[in-house]
């Protein structure tokens, strides 16, 4: 018996690590991934072969959350586990059900972290809606080498401006936190 998803009637939740994922699980997750990219007009970078590779070479680091309805997967979230953290990366669905996104992407991840003793859950980029679920803004840094010197300088200027705007936006969002402030804050 699989546990039901909160408030989703006869939708059941399932969590599998890479070494537990069947070919059907990987194909379903890949289909959800493609669906999301097509929905937003983006080109997917990952392949089904890459998911198979992750499952084989990082069997306990790959974590997939699936929502099942009428004996078939209807949504999935692909996460990676490293150290004390679960990183949410991709989500997709071929059903539209109220609460399905939050259950699959956030609530199952939170449950997993609690069960596994992980101290952090990074649910992915974007989404002011995540604040209501207890996810506060955090800063992520990346480095890129730009070959063209003129473009590099223009991009560097833009990044400095964007950095200031992002920090201000994070300050405003943190003020809307569902958590009480403490003396340590």
Task: Walk through the language-model features, giving the residues of each.
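Short, solvent-exposed polar/charged micro-motifs at secondary-structure junctions
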Residues: 23-28, 131-133, 150-151
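A conserved beta-strand-loop-helix scaffold within acyl/acetyltransferase catalytic domains
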Residues: 10-98, 180-185
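Single conserved hydrophobic/aromatic residue that forms the stacking wall/gate
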Residues: 1-12
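Short, flexible, glycine/charge-rich loop motifs used to bind or transfer phosphoryl groups or to couple energy/partner
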Residues: 1-2, 54-55, 111
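In a subset of proteins, long, contiguous C-terminal domains/tails are tracked
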Residues: 146-147, 152-185
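Acyl-donor binding region in acyl/amide transferases
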Residues: 83-149, 156
